[in-house]
Amino acid sequence: MSQLDVLIVDDEESIRNLIAANLKDEGFNPKIAANSTQALKIISEKPVSAVILDIWLQGSEIDGLGVLEIIKKRYPLMPVIIISGHGTIETAVNAIKMGAYDYIEKPFNNDKLIILLKRACEVTKLKRENIDLKSKVIDKTELVGGCPVTLKYKMEIEKAASSSSRIMIHGKVGSGKELAARLIHKQSKRVNNPFIIFSPTCMTTEKINQELFGESEKQENNNKRPTILEFANNGTLYIDEISNIPIPIQVKLLKFLKDQTITKPCGKKTKVDIKIITSTAKNIQDEVNNGKFLEDLYYRLNVFSLKVPSLYERKEDIPLLVKYFVKQLSKFSGLKERHFSDEAIAALQSYEWPGNIRQLRNVVEWTLIMNPLTTGNNEIIKPYMIPSEILANSANLTKLEDSFDMLSMPLREAREVFERQYLSAQMSRFNNNISKTSSFVGMERSALHRKLKLLSLHIPPTNRINEEEYEKANA
């Protein structure tokens, strides 16, 4: 087994050297640091397997609890064992609440420390293996789908990931803007560094100011909690719904973007390296025109503009998305894995989905919960099992509209009404894709073009697969 790197952080040199010697005898590779600055530098250069951390760190810029907070934010799985010569029960409890693996008082028994350290490393190893196993089953940063719109979108994400420019993600509510940001980070050179999400929605101006810049009227002088910008250093900062940031903070953010420099409580200026991704469901240009967003800030953040397609634009992906959500819910929520019938999928594809991907996932979950697998109920999900509001607002594929009485019509007229409704629903289902619609309904594309013209069903020019064929069919 390869040696595990363990960082020892203590302001007393004799303690550092003693622990380091004992760890070396036990097959560990010890690293030492006398203060918070040295400790965080060592970890940022190469994450260690575990940390043994003194809680006080006299003369250090940040005390042990502050270092613990930073480590758990950046490396949630990294085990930290807290040591202290004059701690209290309250201090120990606080350390454990903040994520410390355990707490041990000085003077400590060397064998006890070694046993504790080995146990912490083993537990962390099992956690990592469990996470790796789950990620192989379902990748939470996977963009599901293979329709042309999605493939183009995936290519745009790859370009955004390879770029060092700032990125603004535009998309409707529930379309997957955070997923896009995660994918960009995952495919970038910063993948092994922090990915920090900051959502200013529902925050006060003072709270946003404190989180980003560490400035607050209520902040005590000895409160040196790192800011969001410090946490994101060398990584990616994703600011969700950037339009919710008030003008005073926009001014400060604009100033920061000019040189990416932050000022610490001591007055020292520090340069940080952050890839900034923002997102919005609003039209920021309209916000600029209405005086709600700084024009200069908009231009600085919107260097690379990425539009997230709505679910309506990628209805062909719905079968794959449904399978993905069913598998995900089965693995992590305990719901039985089910199969949606072709008719149920068709009904889902005919819906407009104003809530986009998020709404589809909720509908799949609701359907599985409300239709449990029983002895009298097979595994197939039928259309009637889907929420009634979805069916009511879908293009109906199973019956004629109520606005006419089929029995009162001649055969030719009734057939024409049925064909219009049927083809309209199928075209909507396949997002006006002539090729896929014709393949499903069993018609040649040219014949389908003629039939649509005869029924006065028009196709948007952007969805005509072959303009030359279209013109020939409509000549």
Swiss-Prot record:
Instruction: Please cite one Gene Ontology biological process associated with this protein.
Output: phosphorelay signal transduction system
Q: Which InterPro entries match?
A: AAA+_ATPase, CheY-like_superfamily, Homeodomain-like_sf, HTH_Fis, P-loop_NTPase, Sig_transdc_resp-reg_receiver, Sigma_54_int, Sigma_54_int_dom_CS
What are the residue boundaries of the Response regulatory domain, all occurrences included?
Answer: 5-121
Q: Which UniProt keywords apply?
A: ATP-binding, Nucleotide-binding, Phosphoprotein, Transcription, Transcription regulation, Two-component regulatory system
Residues that hold ATP according to the record: 171-178, 232-241
**Which residue pairs form cystines in this protein?**
none
Q: What are the residue boundaries of the Sigma-54 factor interaction domain, all occurrences included?
A: 143-369
- Among the Pfam families in the record, one is Response_reg
Q: GO molecular function of the protein, one example?
A: ATP hydrolysis activity
What SMART domains has UniProt attached to this entry? Answer: AAA (SM00382), REC (SM00448)
Q: Which domain of life is it from?
A: Bacteria
Q: Which residues form the signal peptide?
A: none
Residue(s) carrying 4-aspartylphosphate: D54
Tell me which PANTHER family the record gives.
Answer: TRANSCRIPTIONAL REGULATOR (NTRC FAMILY), TRANSCRIPTIONAL REGULATORY PROTEIN
Q: What job does this protein perform? A: Member of the two-component regulatory system RP562/RP614.
Q: What is this protein called?
A: Putative response regulator NtrX-like
Q: Which organism is it from?
A: Rickettsia prowazekii (strain Madrid E)
State the taxonomy lineage.
Answer: Bacteria, Pseudomonadati, Pseudomonadota, Alphaproteobacteria, Rickettsiales
